[in-house]
UniProtKB/Swiss-Prot annotation:
Pfam families assigned to the protein according to its UniProt record, in alphabetical order: Ribosomal_L32p
Any single Gene Ontology cellular-component annotation: large ribosomal subunit
HAMAP family in alphabetical order: Ribosomal_bL32
GO BP annotation list: translation
Protein name: Large ribosomal subunit protein bL32
InterPro entries in the cross-refs: Ribosomal_bL32, Ribosomal_bL32_bact, Ribosomal_zn-bd
Length: 57
């Protein structure tokens, strides 16, 4: 097992952990049906950017 030779400072520890944050999911409201949808994805009603992409489920 690896054992550290010196104690790491808070600054080095925090710099290492700077990329560990969870990504925030952007949520928008569909202009066509009013349901919540994730950004840059088609809604469940079949609309994307006011264009019909698929048939409604």
């Amino acid at each position: 097992m690896a054992v550290q030779q010196r104690r790491s400072s808070k600054h080095r520890r925090d710099k290492r952990r700077s990329h560990d944050a969870l990504a925030v999911n952007l949520i928008n409201v569909c202009k066509h049906c009013g349901k919540f949808k994730r950004a840059h994805r088609a809604c469940s009603c079949g609309m994307y950017n006011e264009l019909r992409i698929t048939k409604a489920k």
